[in-house]
Amino acid sequence: MATYAVLGATGNCGTALIDNLLRTEGAQIHAFCRNKPKLMQKMPALVDHKRVQIYEGSIDDIDLLAECIRGTRAIFHVVTTNDNVPGCQVGLDTAQSIIAALESLQALEPEGTKPPKIVLLSSGTIDDHLSRHMPSFFRRILRAAASHVYEDLRRTEAFLRAQPDGVSTIFIKPGGLSIDVQRGHALNLDRDESFVSYLDLAAAMIEAADDPDDRFDGKNVSVANTNGAARFPMGTPLCILTGLARHSFPWLHRYLPATGPG
């Protein structure tokens, strides 16, 4: 069975990916995180789990990252932040480390070995086509409220699209996300939808990565609900307000609370 690398394993999407993969028969998981105790606290079932290998360290540790992604089918790049952090570039830094790790592995692998595909968690809000149904004034508000994060995503996407043909990336661009139960999903190339649970998002990412015909490689892919929308995240208003403050007054960042979808 296939092996998958999850980068950003302690986040909402990372834990949802691990949850889904644990329910996939035979799937092996390489979870990369900065803080193993935090991951164990969030997911106690991972302690001594035979199908899970945890890699604890910095994303700048190319040797450790190469060990994590070696022999995998897909690399789920879900390293990001819910807060509009000025100067944010965690997405780009992670993507650059992934490419450096892949290049180091290429020198060790037999010629013709197919590298794992990258599945990047991005956002439908920055995609004019997927989010065209959203009122323009509200889209401007959302783009400002996460301006620093979205700029990081744009730069990350541009970097990955500039890679040689042998490196394939799927760009997952959901609408609003919520911590909620799994209801059922469908991959959608035409529009995003709000709200989608992290569990449904994760299932969609795995489906796209596993597509036998590679139909989603290089494409912007969103996620639709098939059995009702996820609940409204109560933390959204505060997240938007503090994001707008960080956009207009970046120096306020250190004084503002950390937020999340909730």
Swiss-Prot record:
Class of this enzyme: oxidoreductase
Pathway(s) it belongs to: Secondary metabolite biosynthesis
Coiled-coil ranges per UniProt: none
Enzyme Commission (EC) number: 1.-.-.-
Keywords: Monooxygenase, Oxidoreductase
GO molecular function: monooxygenase activity
InterPro entries: NAD(P)-bd_dom, NAD(P)-bd_dom_sf
Domain of life of the source: Eukaryota
Gene3D superfamilies associated with the record: NAD(P)-binding Rossmann-like Domain (3.40.50.720)
Disruption phenotype: Leads to total loss of monodictyphenone and agnestin biosynthesis and accumulates emodin but only traces of chrysophanol.
Similarity remark: Belongs to the avfA family.
Function: Oxidoreductase; part of the gene cluster that mediates the biosynthesis of agnestins, dihydroxy-xanthone metabolites. The pathway begins with the assembly and cyclization of atrochrysone thioester by the non-reducing polyketide synthase Agnpks1. The atrochrysone carboxyl ACP thioesterase AgnL7 then breaks the thioester bond and releases the atrochrysone carboxylic acid as the first enzyme-free intermediate.
Protein's UniProt name: Oxidoreductase AgnL4
